[in-house]
C-alpha cells in the first residue's frame, strides 16, 4: 500500500537539512545516513549518500531514475553465496 498523497514522501529531517546545506554551498560530499526508509526526492539528485546496510555504509550515487524509490533499495543487506553444484561421484568396483 502506498503512502497518502496529502502526507507527501517520507524523508528524514536530518537528511533533508544536510542536503539543503550542501545544495546552498554547492559542495559534493558523501552524506552518511542510517535512514533506509527515506524516499529519494529530486533535490537529492547528484549527491552521494552512504546508506547503512547493517554492517557498513554503502555509497549510493543518486540519479534521476531513482526518484521515488527508498534509499534502502540500493544498499543490499544480504549477501548471496552461490548454491553448491552437485558432483556425481562414480565409484570403481
UniProtKB/Swiss-Prot annotation:
Transmembrane segments: none
Superkingdom field: Eukaryota
Cell compartments where the protein resides: Plastid, Chloroplast
SUPFAM superfamilies found in the cross-reference section: Ribosomal protein S19 (SSF54570)
A GO term, aspect molecular function: rRNA binding
One GO term describing the cellular component: mitochondrial small ribosomal subunit
GO process annotations (BP): ribosomal small subunit assembly; translation
Listed PROSITE patterns: RIBOSOMAL_S19 (PS00323)
Keyword NAD tagged: no
UniProt keyword list: Chloroplast, Plastid, Ribonucleoprotein, Ribosomal protein, RNA-binding, rRNA-binding
UniProt similarity note: Belongs to the universal ribosomal protein uS19 family.
Role played: Protein S19 forms a complex with S13 that binds strongly to the 16S ribosomal RNA.
Name by which UniProt lists this protein: Small ribosomal subunit protein uS19c
Species, as recorded: Stigeoclonium helveticum (Green alga)
Amino acid at each position: 500500500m502506498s503512502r497518502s498523497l496529502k502526507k507527501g514522501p517520507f524523508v528524514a529531517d536530518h537528511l533533508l537539512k544536510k542536503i539543503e546545506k550542501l545544495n546552498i554551498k554547492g559542495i559534493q560530499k558523501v552524506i552518511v545516513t542510517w535512514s533506509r526508509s527515506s524516499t529519494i526526492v529530486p533535490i537529492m539528485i547528484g549527491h552521494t549518500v552512504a546508506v547503512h546496510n547493517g554492517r557498513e555504509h554503502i555509497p549510493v550515487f543518486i540519479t534521476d531514475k531513482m526518484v521515488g524509490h527508498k534509499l534502502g533499495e540500493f544498499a543490499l543487506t544480504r549477501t548471496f553465496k552461490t548454491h553448491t553444484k552437485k558432483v556425481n561421484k562414480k565409484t570403481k568396483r
